[in-house]
UniProtKB/Swiss-Prot annotation:
Probable homotrimer. Interacts with DNAJB13. Keywords: Coiled coil, Differentiation, Disease variant, Glycoprotein, Golgi apparatus, Membrane, Nucleus, Spermatogenesis, Transmembrane, Transmembrane helix. It holds the Pfam family Sad1_UNC. Changing T275M: In SPGF16; significant reduction in protein expression; impaired localization to nuclear inner membrane; in mouse model decreases interaction with DNAJB13. This is SUN domain-containing protein 5. The lineage of its organism: Eukaryota, Metazoa, Chordata, Craniata, Vertebrata. It is found in: Nucleus inner membrane; Golgi apparatus.
Length: 379
């Protein structure tokens, strides 16, 4: 609505403003109610006490207008205060927001600057570190790889050698029992397992005393027994037992199961042991060992006429083809001859075979002599 052209001090203008403003209107209504109450109470008071009353309507209206203006100004000030507070509050929030935004922006800029500086100086430092810290270990690693390659070649060579040895062992395991036995027999035939000097060896001067030795068995049966081709009368002399050649048929045979042989030693010897050797059953032409000697007695002989000294009685087991017998009686004297007297064999009534006889002892007298156990002389 357009404003009226009334002056500010006009009471009508004030009333009009009061009509448009609700709060001054309420104040004016209160003023009217107060005037009415005064009018209502005035008759009662006039009834009791009659005083002179002066009505001033113009002053009352002016007061009401002033009160309405004050109320209006108060409301306007309150609204201005509220709006000012809101504006100030919003301004503070904006300031805080701007401050935080600036702080975060500064931090981001600082981080970006630091990263830029780090990226500029890092490559050179990384290069130096690689030169100092990586090249050394890399060189060591290359040397280690070369050593590993070298040792790998050696390992391959060793593995090849091991494979060859394994193949040979497998071949040896695949050999039959007969081959193993034959090899063992050949070793026993050609090898000397008695590591003692043999004073009955023909090659060093030992011989046979034929005067005190049994007659050699000479018969057609022996010829057919040992040789299939009958070209000559087959018989080996007694001194064959003084040679190391122990092969089937290369033995001295005497008739029956009783006989003797006297061996003249190469020199006088303090006797300690005697060894008998026979062929194994596996290579015997007859397939048996019935011609091997069984029970026998050993005598030491010295002087002329020769005196016999009993040295021991023994039994030969043909399963053990080489047997060494320690003498039961070892007198403290040296002997120049040894007699081996056989009293039985292992079942052959026709003849007995001796393959090899060895005599062991020492040239010097032994330090300690065992207790002598002399036996009566035997023919």
């Amino acid at each position: 609505m357009p404003r009226s052209s009334r002056s500010p001090g006009d009471p009508g203008a004030l009333l009009e403003d009061v009509a448009h403003n609700p709060r001054p209107r309420r104040i004016a209504q209160r003023g009217r109610n107060t005037s009415r109450m005064a009018e209502d109470t005035s008759p009662n008071m006039n009834d009791n006490i009659l005083l002179p009353v002066r009505n001033n309507d113009q002053a009352l209206g002016l007061t009401q207008c002033m009160l309405g203006c004050v109320s209006w100004f108060t409301c306007f000030a309150c609204s201005l205060r509220t709006q000012a507070q809101q504006v100030l509050f919003n301004t503070c929030r904006c300031k805080l927001l701007c401050q935080k935004l600036m702080e975060k922006t500064g931090i981001l800029l600082l981080c970006a600057f630091g990263f830029w500086m780090f990226s500029i100086h890092l490559p050179s430092k990384m290069k130096v570190w690689q030169d100092d810290s990586i090249n050394g270990p890399l060189q060591s690693l290359r040397l280690y790889q070369e050593k590993v390659r070298h040792h790998s070649g050696e390992i391959q060579d060793l593995r090849g050698s091991m494979n060859q040895l394994i193949a040979k062992l497998q071949e040896m395991e695949a050999m039959s029992d007969e081959q193993k036995m034959a090899q063992k027999i050949m070793k026993m035939i050609h090898g000397d397992y008695i590591e003692k000097p043999d004073f009955a060896l023909k090659s060093i001067g030992a011989s046979i005393d034929f005067e005190h030795t049994s007659v050699t068995y000479n018969h057609e049966k022996a010829h057919s027994y040992w040789n299939w081709i009958q070209l000559w009368n087959y018989a080996q002399p007694p001194d064959v037992i003084l040679e190391p050649n122990v092969t089937p048929g290369n033995c001295w045979a005497f008739e029956g199961d009783r006989g003797q042989v006297t061996i003249q030693l190469a020199q006088k010897v303090y006797l300690s042991n005697l060894t008998l050797q026979h062929i194994p059953k596996t290579i015997s032409l007859s397939g048996s060992l019935d011609t091997a000697p069984k029970d026998f007695v050993i005598y030491g002989m010295e002087g002329s006429p020769k005196e016999e000294v009993f040295l021991g009685a023994f039994q030969f087991q043909p399963e053990n083809i080489i047997q060494m017998f320690p003498l039961q009686n070892q007198p403290a004297r040296a002997f120049s001859a040894v007699k081996v007297k056989i009293s039985s064999n292992w079942g052959n009534p026709g003849f007995t075979c001796l393959y090899r006889v060895r005599v062991h002892g020492s040239v010097a007298p032994p330090r300690e002599q065992p207790h002598q156990n002399p036996y009566p002389k035997r023919d």
